[in-house]
Amino acid sequence: MKKISACFILSIFLMFITSCTGSGFKKYFEKTVEISIQEDKNLIYATGTIISNDGLIITNKHVVENKNNILINYYDSPDIKYEANIINVSSNYDLALIKIDKKTSFFNKIDEEFSLGQKIYSIGNAKGYGLFLGEGIITSEYKNVIYNKEEILSIQTNIEIYDGCSGGPVFNKKGNLLGLMAFRLRDDGKYILGMS
């Protein structure tokens, strides 16, 4: 009987912890969008980070540059698509600004300070299967990496990144934006997971 009671209490405790954690992170999912782009016969997936309440979204340049038919949807309404327009593409960084006509919540604080070993979180649209939460640490501070024949100043993390995660927010435990997931490279059998 004691075993059953202990298991029941443990189950209730785990459900409570899960619900608290889930509701705590839900607000960050509301500030992140899924991106899909039809290119010829291929469908490209990516992620976007909302940075203003009037529909401005930041993502990676390599995702949207020279692309048409950029569609946006939210995790809680996957059947509703918004067409995005490219506002600006950075010539120096792997960043692009796009816009949709929708009022929404957004990441309103950016934190430029971080440290080696710091716990961080990310949200990504892995392979177009919808948004998911990743957790990890900063494993290397500023590092120049060659990606697509360009030298990119990046931060290395051990968060898993899949196709479709580019442009997703990386944030700290306070919910302040630190950067975007940008690329994954294989180097000497190990992955370098970059954040711009």
Question: What is each of the regions a protein language model found here?
Answer:
Residues 1-4:
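Positively charged n-region of N-terminal signal peptides that target proteins for export
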Residues 7-8, 191:
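Composition-driven detection of intrinsically disordered, low-complexity segments
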Residues 8-16:
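Bacterial N-terminal signal peptides
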Residues 26-41, 100-106, 132-196:
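Active-site region of chymotrypsin-like
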Residues 39-45, 52-124, 128-132:
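Conserved active-site neighborhood of the chymotrypsin/trypsin-like protease fold
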Residues 46-49, 167-169:
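Beta-propeller and closely related beta-sheet repeat lectin domains
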